[in-house]
Amino acid sequence: MATYVLGIADRHSDNIMVKKTGQLFHVDFGHILGHFKEKFGIRRERVPFVITNDFVHVINRGQTKKGQSKEFEKFQKSCETAFLVLRKYGNLMLSLFAMMISTGLPELSSEKDLSYLRDTLVSPTKSFYYFKKC
């Protein structure tokens, strides 16, 4: 959910690592706040977030169909809860990102760059719709 809210792009299996404990962690944060990669004028990320069949397989303990298991329902509920927590602290996140505008990050150089963050934090209904659709 954090990658969705922060608009972190270029998410693929080479940028998501797994620790021996089973915890996931992300690397390569070169594209944030909705500055998605394009190739030949085509936006590479076409949906707000992606849950691959491999991830569904792991979540469902071997099943590949989304929504077919209690594990997937628990995962979905956990994502919704995580979003609500992020949303609760949305003003703080916006303030912290606003303070970073002068740091020289190429994708955070003006107040306009904060609009993606504002938009993702606006509506839980819209976010839950995207999540359930994926």
Which positions does each model-derived feature cover?
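Conserved kinase catalytic-core helix
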Residues: 1-9, 24
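ATP-dependent kinase catalytic cores of phosphoinositide-metabolizing enzymes
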Residues: 13-14, 18-134
